[in-house]
Amino acid sequence: MVIEFDPIAPTSWADPYPTYRALRDTAPVHRSPSSGFYSVSRYEDVLSVLKRPEAFSSRAMFTVLMNGGKEELPALSWDFVRFLVRFPLRTRLNPFAFPKARNLIADDPPGHGTLRNVVNRGFTPRRIAAWEPRIRELVEQHLGALRRGEPFDLVHDFAIPLPVTVIAEMLGIEPERQRDFKRWSDAVIEGATGAGRARPFAPVYVDAVLELMAYLRRAIARRRRAPGDDLISAILADAPGGTRLSPTEAVLFVQLLLVAGNETTTNLIGNAVQALLDHPEQLARVRREPALVPALVEEALRFDAPVQTVFRTATRDVEL
């Protein structure tokens, strides 16, 4: 049986679960002839990969994703040259600093642990508890905007605008820039993993990302001069013996928070509601027992995850 599966092809995600089953049953380590990526599908094997960063590294993730499975920098093209020229002009950042910049989801231990500590400054139990009333208020506002008894588009009218509003407020971003944040986030994701993968430096993606980085650089500079009570200020705060982020690293951190707090939450809401509609007996049970909602969220993350893959680069020959 020949299984056609490419983990970086957008067409792979319309209904991946029958393919996952076939992979587990007949090809637990599967190589895509189109991209060269290997897919590991069995739980024990996935766990083995994730627990061995010395053999399976996160560091080359972005370069590999944007360059068709190759670790070297992209070949020169007009798009790439245009990007290199426009990058410092638009962002006032050094494009050649990015390959060496530390990134939370593209680093291995012990550096990864150091960067996690930076993020944890902004997600202490006290801060999370302080945000909860405002997040509940925003949920009520977005639900209140839906007209009772009339049809609505769950994703467009609720699941998209709510996470954008929440993460923008947490980051201390002006309300009038929230539409820009959604557009920027979409460009980052689409250029790296979606339809833009075939041409990741195309102007339609690059211009939006450069606009985002320029905005974040200015916002970060303001927080360094005058810290506030927002998430950006918390991440930039100097901890005793802690890590100070470079300008490039700070932009990457905030960009990651924007994307992680936006697209994933939208997908989670949509997937969870679809699963409940597909299983009306579970929907009825949750309605009868609202205390089950926290467990519902956890199960939705497992049952139809908003993020379907994690990427690693083998540092040596390995047998699973």
Predicted regions and their residues:
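Cytochrome P450
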Residues: 1-320
